[in-house]
């Protein structure tokens, strides 16, 4: 009966207004929150979201970026444990699946700019009578992830209910996979050449104990005592009023000074993968390398964007210490770490804290701890005696997931080239160094800053291009060209320009075809390297600010020429008078002008001081705006000042 209900009943309610959502959910919380230590929830709108001050709590997720310096290999910056001691580290990663809809409802996933409580169905808000319908697309992405982790995918897996009460869980339980998960017994290899480990001796293989599907919770925001709010009366208009605000707009007030908790249900029910590692890691660097490689992998297969600063990838870390050769010690869990750097800091502090406690004849208690970002310390949240009894039980509204060998075969053959295989091929095919490969493969592993781009200034073609894979881009540019030359232009000019403008790596800023044409012009001597660098800077600036090409070079101008020309970059540079001056006839007016303005240098060159000729060359290059061939300019100057002076 339950199976038929799950397959036949579709939950397609329209998104709820703020008023109906409050009426629906508030009684549920009021029943339990009388006299409870849990903050009372409020459902809020976008104006409050912007002004909210987050409180450090084990249910609050805040974003943080990974700096480029964190990703560099080198000596460990974390102090080692005292001799004879070791840390044992396991990590639970919660990875939000990158799909259009949530795991069991038709609501779409929010973006960072989505107003609170506007992408919520009745099922997401736990309205009585609604039933779940499994998102098959999310299931496929989870299965692809399991295959890429070399996991064993079970032919049959089931969903369970994990019961606990908190304001960000309207139903009072989370749908997860406790007893029969989707997959287990996988592994990830951490290699020194990937650039995250201090030495080759740190290379390990980390086991993947389990990969399971589950729902995400709502997003909570917390306010300190002294910050209170009142509802705007306009937002309390009748729910049928089309002009009513989609979220309750709150304003600060001076009365009723209490702690407040505000809940945004947009994220509630989003599809998550919980990926549980084995306890093979021993150092913060190994833990950081593990999370970064997992992040790289889920991005490569399209399962998640893995942005820790936006909550798409969150980590809980289990840390214990013991003397080498003795049984593992009592573990402590550090919850909700939202950046790799914070996670590594937390592991280092927690392992040293436990060793110091044991050396002083103390006892490590099994407990859940939080991380203080301001001083890099961990703090107690609750002990084992306070841990909730989740009372897992099979979910009666969901049938088992059945996957055939044929389905798994199709998923396996649909996987893209995975990072390890890709790395090996780049070395063999192009002869790239590990350092160069790391630069290409790490593009996009830091902050994605798409939200900062003025997309209204980009043309339709640009908005349709969303590729951010630097390796694919490199291979397109390198086709028919020197791989090292292509790499140098990408890393030292294109990426440098993107970083200077605070832009993410997206191909449509400078399509590979156009960069390739520009490189060819430089190699053929038709454009100088100086001019080419200026061209790249102009193209990036035009893409960022929306120039139409009248005052500087623009991609729109290149694409317009591409409709009638096979070499639009050459044609545009020719139109703008930016081609190199490659003949003595073109250079003579500039050379003569420079010699007239530098008579002292001319006299010294004629006396045999040939080094001074470079001053004249510099003046010519300046007058030519970098378009002159410096070698030909030097030769022309020496010829003009007398054949006896020529080398």
Curated annotation (Swiss-Prot):
PROSITE patterns given in the database record: GATB
Gene3D superfamilies: 1.10.10.410
SUPFAM superfamilies: GatB/YqeY motif (SSF89095), Glutamine synthetase/guanido kinase (SSF55931)
Reaction catalysed by this enzyme: L-glutamyl-tRNA(Gln) + L-glutamine + ATP + H2O = L-glutaminyl-tRNA(Gln) + L-glutamate + ADP + phosphate + H(+)
Low complexity bias (residue ranges): 58-76
Pfam family for this entry, one: GatB_Yqey
Keyword Protein biosynthesis carried by entry: yes
Cellular location(s): Mitochondrion
Renumbered residue ranges of the record's region Disordered: 39-77
Highest taxon of the lineage: Eukaryota
Any one Gene Ontology BP term: mitochondrial translation
Gene Ontology molecular function, alphabetical: ATP binding; glutaminyl-tRNA synthase (glutamine-hydrolyzing) activity
Family designation: Belongs to the GatB/GatE family. GatB subfamily.
Described purpose of this protein according to its UniProt entry: Allows the formation of correctly charged Gln-tRNA(Gln) through the transamidation of misacylated Glu-tRNA(Gln) in the mitochondria. The reaction takes place in the presence of glutamine and ATP through an activated gamma-phospho-Glu-tRNA(Gln).
Matches recorded under HAMAP family: GatB
The protein's name in its UniProt record: Glutamyl-tRNA(Gln) amidotransferase subunit B, mitochondrial
